[in-house]
Design a protein with these regions (language model features):
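C-terminal transmembrane helical hairpin of 12-TM major facilitator-type secondary transporters
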Residues: 190-234
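Helix-loop-helix hairpin linking two adjacent transmembrane segments in secondary transporters
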Residues: 53-102
């Protein structure tokens, strides 16, 4: 909430950067604590479904940002009112959560620490799950940020149209989280994880080989659809296997989203050294 209110009341380049920093810190803390909290309040066999639905709600909130900014600019002459509205909503959410009674899973005499978190990386299964998040977040950010340039250079699509590839990808992701929330009530997390991973890998490979721009658009949509549920699936599968370490696992997986900063740099470097197809 502070990250949104600071740039609203003190709008300057420095304050916007400060607000971004606060938003990043706050968002990380919320996700580290909210994921295991959600697992505590939903039926055990529905954790993946509700985690996917939470990603859908998050996507809807992200999508509302641009049209709301346009509305406030047209109606009140100040798009920055968006900061105030989102800040107030954040405060209300904190108050609502603070007054809700939730019975958290606790183990007597056990406390999660930095040491206990990093010690879990010695477990091959947990390490593999954390690396999965590192890679999939990197692919998510890298593909989303480079899809426009890929369409321009690979298929000669006009820039304005090509840059809307991000919207196609985002729509696929949003639809994927909603569909995943429904399907995961009927399909096991492990089976869904296997098939959605296979779909994502096949579509990523296919988009490098196709010669048609129209087919590439379709594949971009399906890549978003496939990647959409990887995060909630990996988290729920890991917590299902190690339920007493859900806080540590949540922290490790939030640390693994650094893949979103590392892998896009690698994609850019390879693209500069050869071409964007090799980078992708």
């Amino acid at each position: 909430a502070l990250g949104l209110l600071v740039p609203f009341f003190m709008y300057s380049f420095a304050m916007v950067l400060f607000g971004f920093a606060l938003l990043g810190i706050g968002n990380t803390i919320v996700q580290v604590s909210a994921n295991p909290l959600l697992v505590d309040v939903v039926p055990g066999n529905r954790a993946s479904s509700f985690l996917s639905f939470s990603q859908f709600i998050k996507a809807v909130g992200s999508m509302l940002g641009a049209p709301l900014a346009g509305f406030f600019a047209a109606k009140f002459g100040d798009w920055k009112l968006l900061f105030l509205v989102f800040g107030i909503v954040s405060i209300l959410a904190v108050l609502w959560l603070g007054t809700s009674k939730i019975t958290e899973t606790r183990v007597e005499g056990y406390k999660a620490t930095f040491g206990s978190s990093f010690k879990l990386l010695g477990n091959n299964f947990v390490l593999l799950m954390v690396l999965s998040i590192f890679v999939v977040v990197g692919v998510d950010v890298g593909f989303n940020s480079n899809s426009g340039q890929f369409l321009i250079k690979q298929f000669g699509i006009e820039q304005t149209a090509a840059e809307s590839g991000r919207s196609v990808y985002f729509f696929g992701r949003m639809l994927g989280t909603f569909a995943g929330a429904i399907m995961l009530t009927r399909i096991s997390s492990r089976s869904f994880f296997m098939w959605t991973s296979i779909l994502g890998i096949l579509c990523l490979a296919a988009i490098l080989l196709v010669k048609s721009g129209a087919v590439a658009w379709i594949l971009i949509f399906f890549i978003g659809l496939a990647i959409a549920n990887i995060w909630p699936l990996v988290f729920s599968i890991a917590v299902e296997k190690h339920p007493l370490q859900n806080n540590e696992i949540s922290g490790l997986m939030m640390m693994a989203i650094s893949g979103g900063a590392v892998i896009p740099l690698l994609i850019g470097w390879i693209s500069d050294m050869s071409n964007i197809s090799w980078g992708m």
